[in-house]
């Protein structure tokens, strides 16, 4: 069994590891690793021969360039001794499969903004958000349509110019803050 979860701290990683160990307390081994953006890396072979579980799992994430992640691989003994090479391959494959199933996301800075527009211009403004890789989070319908959107930070000025052009200067983008958000990377399979 392989589990991959995003984490922001060692405490969060350790909490997930402890929960897995508790859930699968009857398993022979709950091997784990985690990597954080600040360079922190930890791993455990959890009773497997040294170097056959934690480090190979860690290498999967290093090669993928992934950080802020925890991985736990739970192994039940099936009656066949795998040997060190077999264990290394099994833990590497389990970590890689779990990562592929979870997918890879990139944490980016986003600009939160609002645009109030006449109903007739709603669709072109919404399409401009999507074309720049943004996301419409909320749409409020009143005398005008207010679009609450998140845009990649670097697209803010381009979006403001597009809104001015689309609305002939009748509407403006109002920044309301910034946030960080994970975005799935296309084609990030292993």
Region spans (language model):
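C-terminal regulatory domains involved in ligand/effector binding and gene-expression control
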Residues: 1-52, 174-190
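Hydrophobic side chains in well-ordered alpha-helices
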Residues: 13-16, 91, 124-128, 159-162
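Positively charged, aromatic-enriched nucleic acid-contacting surfaces
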Residues: 39, 52-66, 141-143
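Active-site beta-strand/loop microenvironment that shapes enzyme catalytic pockets
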Residues: 57-101
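Short glycine-/aliphatic-rich beta-strand segments at the starts of folded cytosolic domains
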Residues: 103-121, 149
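Short amphipathic alpha-helix segments
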Residues: 116-134, 158
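Conserved short beta-strand edge segments in small beta-sheet-based binding/regulatory domains
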Residues: 136-140, 167-184
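Terminal, non-globular segments
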Residues: 149-152, 156
